[in-house]
From Swiss-Prot:
Role description: One of the primary rRNA binding proteins, it binds directly to 16S rRNA where it helps nucleate assembly of the platform of the 30S subunit by binding and bridging several RNA helices of the 16S rRNA.
Domain of life of the source: Bacteria
GO CC, any one term: cytosolic small ribosomal subunit
Assembly with partners or alone: Part of the 30S ribosomal subunit. Forms a bridge to the 50S subunit in the 70S ribosome, contacting the 23S rRNA.
Disordered, as annotated region: 1-22
Name under which the protein is recorded: Small ribosomal subunit protein uS15
Length: 86
């Protein structure tokens, strides 16, 4: 179980050389969060990894807040594309 980083970047980049835009960062974090969520279904007591998951969720929240402040249309498009509720 791993994420295909290149595919996630390809699906969410804004230009040909884009790897660091908020959209790409949020998409990568979302993929990692979904992967870890599945991990916790079988490993309920893995508290060390759960801490990392919470850090990723908080980082994603910060990036989404930044994007919402900078460009609401890009924010709405990203939320809809990734299926995040807010």
């Amino acid at each position: 179980m791993s994420i295909d980083t290149q595919k996630v970047i390809e699906d969410n980049k804004r230009s040909s050389a884009d790897t660091g835009s908020p959209e790409v960062q949020v998409a990568l974090l979302t993929a990692r969060i979904e992967l870890l969520t599945g991990h916790f279904k079988t490993h309920k007591k893995d508290h060390h990894s759960r801490r990392g998951l919470l850090q990723m969720v908080n980082r994603r929240r910060s990036l989404l807040d930044y994007l919402k402040k900078k460009d609401v249309e890009r924010y709405k498009a990203l939320i809809e594309k990734l299926g995040l509720r807010r």
